[in-house]
Amino acid sequence: MKRRAAPSKGKINFENIGALLLDFCPSPFEILPVSLPYKIATLLYCFNAEGEVLLLERAQEPNRGFWSPPGGKLKMDVGESPYVCACREAQEEMGLNLNPADLHLAGIISEFGYQGRTHWLMFLFEVRVKVELLPPPHPEGRFEFFPREKIAGLKIPQTDREQIWPWFWQYRGGFFAAHCHCHGENQNQWTLEESRTGSGK
């Protein structure tokens, strides 16, 4: 009886196997778990009569020791709206009594995997009312007014420096929405999802 020939097997190209493995294996930042906590917050962009912006040197995480607009997280367990949250934070941190009509929704920012710990959704409000008095120190940090041209020289979060501040100024008086896919070593990927120019100021 004649034996059948065994089917030929494909040969492995060992020269290319390294490249194949690199293509197959994601980077450590691409396997970031998507089940991170998702937090919703507001930021308040307040100005005085001279056009200086009020910033908070944060005493709490995240971004401890960095300058950023004041604000805080929504009370999601009671269904708090972003506008109500912004008014509450203005009163708690700065002693300002605001209502939603005093706020202009300047932008919405979503961040995937910020610092590898949290997904964020942030509502950016410009306060229409001028702030004349510097708020006193607060457990969240200390306040100071800065002219626009000084902000770049401050210690501010990388995402603020990369796009949030530039887009805030570019679309001031209008609106913008953007998404940031945060990576390690400040290699962030930004997508501007919507924008409308405003009057600017």
Provide a role label for each language-model segment.
Residues Y45, L55, M122-E126, F145:
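Conserved hydrophobic/aromatic beta-strand scaffold that supports enzyme active sites
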Residues E50, E111-L134, W165-Y171:
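Active-site-adjacent beta-strand/loop module that shapes the phosphate/pyrophosphate-binding cleft
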Residues K2-G10:
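Extreme N-terminal basic, low-complexity initiation segments
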Residues P28-L54:
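Conserved N-terminal beta-strand and adjoining loop/helix that marks the start
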